[in-house]
């Protein structure tokens, strides 16, 4: 076991990664596994520049951090929740799911409350929008400022990525 672990430190944690590190050392073109490693690094926020150098120890260090983070996520959710997007949305929709011990005591009332909370979430969201609209209507003295900011928001609606360049023009006109 110890000799296998030492060889894994030199070549990476998997057989496929060992072949890609050897190819990277000899300068041959990269294969799918190295691209997958780069995309995993980008997804988990790891160092993108470390695996590109092609050193076995660096790739193992980056791979170890990814391998360490994947089982934690899969243990946290159900076995079918390996998709991070599904995991993210399930946490948003029902963030207050009770632990199984609490659910046994008063399961019906808790499930009713959780469904009620999910049903009322769009209502709360629309209520916030109504509050914002009523706040703009309440400031009748600064009616033109409110219109200016609303027109800026509607003009920005298309781009959204460059707020600095577009938002400067309505201010200059005023």
From Swiss-Prot:
Several charge isomers are produced as a result of optional post-translational modifications, such as phosphorylation of serine or threonine residues, deamidation of glutamine or asparagine residues, citrullination and methylation of arginine residues. Chicken MBP contains 4 charge components denoted as C1, C2, C3 and C8. C1 lacks any phosphorylation sites, whereas C2 and C3 contain respectively 10 and 8 phosphorylation sites and arginine residues modified to citrulline. All three charge components contain deamidated glutamines and asparagine, and a methylated arginine. The modification Phosphoserine is found at residues 8, 19, 34, 65, 74, 114, 142, 165, 169. The modification Citrulline is found at residues 25, 42, 166. The modification Phosphothreonine is found at residue 97. This is Myelin basic protein. Homodimer. The modification Deamidated asparagine is found at residue 91. Pfam families: Myelin_MBP (PF01669).
């Amino acid at each position: 076991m110890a000799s296998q672990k030492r060889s894994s430190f030199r070549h990476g944690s998997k057989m496929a990664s060992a072949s890609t590190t050897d190819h990277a050392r000899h300068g041959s073109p990269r294969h799918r596994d190295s691209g997958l490693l780069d995309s995993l690094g980008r997804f988990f926020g790891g160092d993108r520049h470390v695996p590109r150098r092609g050193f076995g120890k660096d790739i193992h260090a980056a791979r170890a951090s990814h391998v360490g983070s994947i089982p934690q996520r899969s243990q946290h959710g159900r076995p079918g929740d390996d998709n991070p997007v599904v995991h993210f949305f399930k946490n948003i929709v029902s963030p207050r799911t009770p632990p199984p011990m609490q659910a046994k005591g008063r399961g019906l009332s808790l499930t009713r409350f959780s469904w009620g909370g999910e049903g009322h979430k769009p209502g709360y969201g629309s209520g916030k929008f109504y509050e914002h609209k009523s706040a703009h209507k309440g400031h009748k003295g600064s009616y033109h400022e409110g219109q200016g900011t609303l027109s800026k928001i509607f003009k920005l609606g298309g781009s959204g990525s460059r707020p600095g360049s577009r938002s400067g023009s309505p201010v200059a006109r005023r």
